[in-house]
Each structure stands twice: as C-alpha cells, then as structure tokens.
Amino acid sequence: MPLPKISEARELSDEKLSDEIVAIKRQLFQLRLQKATRQLEKPHQFRQARHRLAQLLTLETERKRAASQSAKEEK
C-alpha cells in the first residue's frame, strides 16, 4: 500500500482533521503495544502511520497560521 498523499488530507474539514489525528495517534499506540508484546505482523504500518500523522499535523499547523494571519490583517 503506497503512502497517503497530502492532497487527500487537504480535502478534510477541520473537525475531520482533528478526528483523523486522534485516530492515527491511537493506531500508533496500538502498534507500539503490539511491537512490545512481539505480536506485530506488519512493521511497515509504523512508517505509514507516522507519515500520515506528520501530514495531518502539518496541515493543521498551516490552517492555524492562515487563520491567525487573516485575523491580524483584519485588525
């Protein structure tokens, strides 16, 4: 399975974006538990989850900066 594209994440609403971030963090936690108990079957999922989390956090930061920038311009 290829790594997800950030263009797919850009289509998400702010609420969906936050939900997705929480879901990915939970997934990473579960993967770490599986790794610790030696039950992890697909180690490539770590990379995919971290990559997706980085994309989503980057997008969230971009949106927050854009919102604060537009708020400054309105003053």
Curated annotation (Swiss-Prot):
InterPro entries, per the entry: Ribosomal_protein_uL29, Ribosomal_uL29, Ribosomal_uL29_CS, Ribosomal_uL29_sf
GO cellular component: cytosolic large ribosomal subunit
Molecular-function GO term, any one: structural constituent of ribosome
Keywords: Ribonucleoprotein, Ribosomal protein
GO biological process: one example: translation
Protein origin, superkingdom: Bacteria
Gene3D superfamilies (alphabetical): 1.10.287.310
A Pfam family it matches: Ribosomal_L29
Stated family: Belongs to the universal ribosomal protein uL29 family.
Protein name: Large ribosomal subunit protein uL29
Designated gene of the protein: rpmC
